[in-house]
């Protein structure tokens, strides 16, 4: 597994990292936000020989069409196989940039510099790369590890609150699936005042431990998908609508629904289900789901990559801190779990 570097001085640490890698050219992938907010931190005086390409931010741009633009720019920059791609951005950019690097000339090296809380705790670890296709999340992709991941909590200062909140959902998830004490240590009331550096390090350690035991998701790694079967379906459903949900906001809905399924199917204690419900509703509030939307969300669940044949396979909780995988769930059970969410009252 490639080095994950926690950095309080990203500019110096990146230069030191690059000095140890023999490369022909550097190509920098940024989005319109990170170009303004993050690039100057890394390269205060950026030289023109550093080729760069700017993409539009957001999940809706995580497509093959954007990849083709990136590949065209890489080709125009005459990158050879010794070039290195720097991905400076959130999860969308890292997923797509790594995918582009893996395909270009059968693969060039890349370094991920995640700038959002979500990508620092989650997307930058574990080598899953890809893009959305025909409305399906991460439908096309590969497993490939970056040369290095540079995690600088400093970049979080540039994030809007809603983006911080989105990333916090994955931190909560790591506690729910692997570490009850971690979950209980999270400050839900004043989550904005969290010690992000400490939480990121702990979350990355949890995820790295799981991924190192099962890099290609044959078994144990599936526990990281808790909340994601239903959560991804909501995220995908709302991608085109005006009721746009960030990844973490959608996963928060998914985790409440899947905690209910855990209670029904695995006996997750009612008091723990209540604790999970309370945690997510107090941080994320509640979204309104119309009756007519549920069928479409269910259809999207069926398309999930984790399924085997027509059976929907879920990762569910035996208890907080103990997650298991490959639990078959029927369409009607998913519908019931969404009804449970719909009927919840805010405290």
Model-derived features with residue positions:
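ATP/NTP phosphate-donor binding region
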Residues: 1-84
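C-terminal charged capping/lid subdomain of soluble metabolic enzymes
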Residues: 169-171, 270-347
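Short glycine/serine/threonine-rich phosphate/pyrophosphate-binding segments
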Residues: 92-99, 120, 232-233
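Non-catalytic interfacial helical region
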Residues: 71-88, 97-112
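Generic secondary-structure signature for well-ordered alpha-helical cores
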Residues: 76, 145-148, 154-161, 169-181, ...
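A glycine/threonine-rich phosphate-anchoring loop and its flanking beta-alpha core
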Residues: 99-191
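Active-site segments that bind and position negatively charged phosphate/pyrophosphate groups
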Residues: 185-295
């Amino acid at each position: 597994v490639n080095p994950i570097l926690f950095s309080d001085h990203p500019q110096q640490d990146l230069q030191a990292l690059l000095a140890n890698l023999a490369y022909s050219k550097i190509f920098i992938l940024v989005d319109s936000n990170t170009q303004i907010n993050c690039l100057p931190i890394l390269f205060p005086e950026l030289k023109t020989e550093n080729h760069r390409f700017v993409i539009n931010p957001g999940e809706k741009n995580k497509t093959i069409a954007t990849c083709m633009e990136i590949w065209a720019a890489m080709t125009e920059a005459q990158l050879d196989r010794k070039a290195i791609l720097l991905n400076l951005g959130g999860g969308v950019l890292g997923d797509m940039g790594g995918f582009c690097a893996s395909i270009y000339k059968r693969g060039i090296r890349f370094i991920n510099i995640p700038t959002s809380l979500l990508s620092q705790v989650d997307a930058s670890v574990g080598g899953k790369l890809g893009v959305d296709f025909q409305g399906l999340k991460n439908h096309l992709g590969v497993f490939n590890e970056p040369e290095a991941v540079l995690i600088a909590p400093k970049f979080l200062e540039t994030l809007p609150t809603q983006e911080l909140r989105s990333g916090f959902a994955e931190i909560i998830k790591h506690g729910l699936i692997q570490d009850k004490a971690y979950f209980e240590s999270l400050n839900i009331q004043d989550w904005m005042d969290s010690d992000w550096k400490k939480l990121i390090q702990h979350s990355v350690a949890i995820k790295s431990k799981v991924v190192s035991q099962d890099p290609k998701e044959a078994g144990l790694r599936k526990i990281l998908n808790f909340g994601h079967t239903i959560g991804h379906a909501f995220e995908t459903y709302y991608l085109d609508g005006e009721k746009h949900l960030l990844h973490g906001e959608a996963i928060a809905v998914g985790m409440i629904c899947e905690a209910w399924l855990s209670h029904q199917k695995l006996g997750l204690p009612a008091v723990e289900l209540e604790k999970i419900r309370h945690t997510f509703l107090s941080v994320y509030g509640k979204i309104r789901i119309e009756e007519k939307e549920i069928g479409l969300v269910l259809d999207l669940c069926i398309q999930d990559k984790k399924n085997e044949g027509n059976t929907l396979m879920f990762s569910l909780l035996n208890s907080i801190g103990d997650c298991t995988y490959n639990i078959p769930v029927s369409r009607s059970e998913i519908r019931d779990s969404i009804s449970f969410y719909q009927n919840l009252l805010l405290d």
